[in-house]
């Protein structure tokens, strides 16, 4: 989802430039699901080895949170010692109210995500900071 790189960039720039707020589109209530790319790769390998044929299987975390909740978490991870407030631009759209996959079939086949969002966000941020140097 595009909101992750955008959120990381906004928080990083606010931290770097000593800004006291970030601006997010909408009201922050839209819900999203995140899955780290390594988890998707592991799921692909898992299901290739299972030899599941002719079956569509949703791969995701199965857990959603609001954009506001993600923003607070990302702020805590990226700028833990800074006071950066979240402001909402209500003139911009909220987006789809909720995006979360039903992963019950994947679970039925024995797969479940290893979902540690804090670690995944930290890895993503570390990768981002290496790339922008």
Model-derived segments and their meaning:
Residues 6-7, 11-133:
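C-terminal substrate-binding subdomain of Rossmann-fold SDR/epimerase-dehydratase oxidoreductases
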Residues 3:
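The catalytic Tyr-X3-Lys active-site helix of short-chain dehydrogenase/reductase
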């Amino acid at each position: 989802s595009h909101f992750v790189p955008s959120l990381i960039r906004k928080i990083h720039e606010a931290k770097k430039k000593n800004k006291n707020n970030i601006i997010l589109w909408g009201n922050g209530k839209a819900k999203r699901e995140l899955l780290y790319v390594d988890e998707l790769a592991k799921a692909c390998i898992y299901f290739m080895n299972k030899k599941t044929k002719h079956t569509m299987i949703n791969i995701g975390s199965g857990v959603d949170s609001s954009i506001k909740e993600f923003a607070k978490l990302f702020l805590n991870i990226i700028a833990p010692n800074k006071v950066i407030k979240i402001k909402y631009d209500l003139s911009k759209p909220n987006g789809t109210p909720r995006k979360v996959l039903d992963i019950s079939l994947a679970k039925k086949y024995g797969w479940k995500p290893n979902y540690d969002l804090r670690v995944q966000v930290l890895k993503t941020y570390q990768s981002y900071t290496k790339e922008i140097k």
